């Protein structure tokens, strides 16, 4: 089996898509699959890695640290040389011309959808209805262009349910995963924090500081708790275009913006040292930040809708309507519960989502669309 993964809108500091592509790609290689990854880069380059061949295609910057491949034919050149048995798309807009090439060549295509475009654009622009018609048209084009659509949650699946059925495009739900070895609890004796008897409720938010990720809602929740007189501290890890807005929103509340944390172990310690993680975006199709917090033993408060809500249960966190007052209530409810029980429940919840399970499910999808079965090793 020869799988080509294609990703756009990906950069050194980008989050979920980059993490998912890397984790599954390594899993493919470990299973004996020949794997190619094509991504945008500052220059054309080819690198041989233990997880397969990585081809960087020269692409311009489009803001926010991202690069965008604007010449799909150059991706096709890399595919012609690699001769994949299937192509795995991680972008459903700019790379669709590659799906047309694959269909002409008889190469199977799998699209993994990472966002609900309507909700993402609504959160980014504040316009709730104006883009619905063109997005519905795009979704119809998508399901007619690929052989299999993969979604990560029930929330993500609902966007495509009717159009996929009418196009007879099979839809498979594959939850993503978390690195359970990297993201793990910090023993209480090793926590580098102030004594717990100071009474401060420590919150953490990890994510890109861009409107579609709802960092404003996380900050506003901390501000609401501060307004109520709750001793609270919010540490925000991430960077993005709305930092100045968020600082203004925080005002005099105890909110600290730390920027991007490059080391995963350093980030893990900061998450594990918090009492509650705020991952409150109502438009996430999955929520890798939620799983990473849970894996660190930190309970999560999230919105009562969206893919992230599907990851949290009563043993590992709480949820509320995506408004600061409601989320603040959920935080206080969580803080009143036994800490050790919540931390243990959070870790148990994360352990349901190892990357090996996601990789095996995706390999099964590729086997189905290509008809190549029994050609890969089981992943660890």
Model-derived segments and their meaning:
Residues 108-110, 119-141, 180:
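Nucleotide-sugar donor phosphate/pyrophosphate-binding loop at the beta->alpha transition
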Residues 136, 140, 144-173, 178-182:
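A short, active-site helix/loop in glycosyltransferases that binds the activated sugar's phosphate group
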Residues 189-223:
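Conserved donor-binding/catalytic core segment of Leloir-type glycosyltransferases
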Residues 244-261:
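Nucleotide-activated donor-binding/catalytic signature segment of Leloir-type glycosyltransferases, i.e.
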Residues 260, 268-274:
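Short alpha-helical donor nucleotide-sugar binding micro-motif in glycosyltransferases
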Residues 282:
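Aromatic "clamp/platform" in nucleotide-sugar-dependent glycosyltransferases that forms part
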Residues 299-302:
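Short hydrophobic beta-strand element within catalytic cores of glycosyltransferases
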Residues 313-325, 332-338:
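Conserved acidic donor-binding segment of nucleotide-sugar-dependent glycosyltransferases
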